[in-house]
């Protein structure tokens, strides 16, 4: 299946000069979601993954699709202040300032192997911070799974030490 055909494009969203690539049409097509799971299954072996981590918020969707396929658990990486209970946080630099993400403290056991999922890789800042956060609590990064990669923004550069797979590149 050509997933590129399923990705909608919205010029000047969320602001002028941005071309927003949206994978939402994939979600209404069960065969497209199945195709995504099939493609990542060729690349990441289930025996090498203990839990999937979804980056807020669209990464949750991909992580759930893959966790269901692999019969594994899923955890959420969220913006600060969005998770109940004790959390571990990390701050990182973004284009115009700082941002903070967090995970629940007890969600990962020491040594668990984690595949981090997100819909899109742009600059790689959030992805890199997510890896550092998981490693901070003792998780081992198996790699990254992205539906879309914006290659001009060189996001892979910051996470190149990890095994990374993106399905559609622009």
Curated annotation (Swiss-Prot):
Coiled coil: none annotated. Its EC number is 2.4.2.7. GO terms for molecular function: adenine binding; adenine phosphoribosyltransferase activity; AMP binding. Pfam families: Pribosyltran. Pathway: Purine metabolism; AMP biosynthesis via salvage pathway; AMP from adenine: step 1/1. Keywords: Cytoplasm, Glycosyltransferase, Purine salvage, Transferase. InterPro entries: Ade_phspho_trans, PRibTrfase_dom, PRTase-like, UPRTase/APRTase. Homodimer. Catalyzes a salvage reaction resulting in the formation of AMP, that is energically less costly than de novo synthesis. PANTHER family: ADENINE PHOSPHORIBOSYLTRANSFERASE. This is Adenine phosphoribosyltransferase. It comes from Nitrosopumilus maritimus (strain SCM1). The lineage of its organism: Archaea, Nitrososphaerota, Nitrososphaeria, Nitrosopumilales, Nitrosopumilaceae. The gene is apt.
